[in-house]
Design a protein with these regions (language model features):
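Active-site and NAD+-binding cores of ADP-ribose-processing enzymes
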Residues: 1-172, 191-307
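A short, exposed loop/beta-hairpin motif centered on an aromatic-Gly-Thr core
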Residues: 173-178
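Conserved structured core elements
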Residues: 179-183, 246
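Short active-site loop/helix that positions an aromatic residue
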Residues: 182-193
Length: 307
């Protein structure tokens, strides 16, 4: 019987159990907590085997649930992406540009005050040179297009060589992470009080077919729905920096991508009712603007354990 079987010691035995369960055959469907045991077995296999050659009888059940949870992200829907300006690079260049633009008024006041004309001419020539500097022109162009924070390229996903492992992507895979709400996008980068943050607004260039993994802890589930609910919970779980905790979500994400979808959405683990988006091809979205913000404070929620 299943309850007396050595825990995952015989993979063929467990695969048979899963197949029998999927086919609805007695006695496996009658065993208490059978879905939980099958799901734990699935996670055990995924963590202990080479996931690039991973085969498991539960995979077709998982893939079949994707189309049932299809979500169409409409073209031009507002999404938000935040980046931390740790070195104050963007803030400093914006401030320097503001200083450059204010210098003509200062020079004019010097001229009216009888300031040495030779020195004044040198200052005016220097200002003209700075105005025509390629870096100044770049910043002006960026600001004119509505990008106070990072420019359009900087608002998208990082280059593959800089992409570190995340909830949905393995190292070197560049997905675009965004959020439905501005404050969710900020919370997801976990900034410190006093940080300056670039917040971008992005729009999908076309309607995108996503898999909805939004987690509802109060949902009533039964049968095969249990496995999809567990997947949703994996995406909504708080991660404390352990990369191994991302193996499940990274694998499910790869299943979604290779099933032909453009991305997925799931509940934020940091913001109640916040929604995150992952777009597999960053070029499917375009940044339309960005702004620089200062993190003033963070509000914590907590509850007391009762004995």
């Amino acid at each position: 019987m299943l309850v007396n079987a050595p825990k995952y010691s015989d993979l063929a035995y467990w695969d048979n159990i899963v197949n029998q369960y999927i086919q609805g055959k007695h006695p496996y469907i009658l065993i208490p907590n059978i879905e939980r045991q099958i799901w734990d077995y699935f996670k055990y296999c995924l963590k202990s085997q080479n996931r690039y050659f991973f085969q498991h009888p539960l995979i077709p059940v998982i893939k079949a649930s994707f189309e049932k949870n299809l979500y169409i992200l409409k073209k031009d829907t507002e999404l938000f992406r935040a980046r931390n300006d740790n070195q104050h690079t963007i803030w400093k260049e914006n401030w320097r540009y503001a200083e450059i633009m204010s210098e003509p008024k200062y020079l004019e006041r010097l001229r009216n005050s009888g300031y040495d004309s030779t020195k004044l001419d040198e200052m005016c020539a220097n200002h003209s040179s700075v105005l025509n500097d390629p870096e100044t022109i770049r910043i002006k162009d960026k600001l004119d297009r509505g990008f106070q924070g990072y420019d359009a390229d900087g608002c998208s996903a990082p280059p593959s060589e800089l992409a570190s492992a995340g909830r949905c992507n393995s190292e070197g895979v560049a997905y675009l992470y965004a959020a439905q709400e501005e404050h969710t996008a900020v919370a997801e980068i976990r900034p410190y009080v006093g940080d300056t943050i670039s917040i971008a607004t992005l729009h999908p260039k076309r309607d995108l077919r996503l898999v909805n993994l939004d987690y509802d802890p109060s949902a009533t589930i039964s049968g095969a729905e249990f496995f999809y609910h567990e997947i949703q919970e994996e995406f909504a779980r708080v991660n404390k920096g352990q990369k191994s905790d991302y193996l499940i979500t990274q694998y499910i994400t790869s299943l979604v991508e290779h099933s032909g979808y453009s991305g997925l959405c799931f509940r934020s683990s940091l913001v109640e009712d916040g929604t995150n988006y992952v777009i597999f091809r960053p070029n499917d979205c375009e940044a339309v603007s960005s702004k620089i913000c200062y993190l003033k404070g963070v509000q914590y929620q907590y509850f007391q354990f009762k004995s």
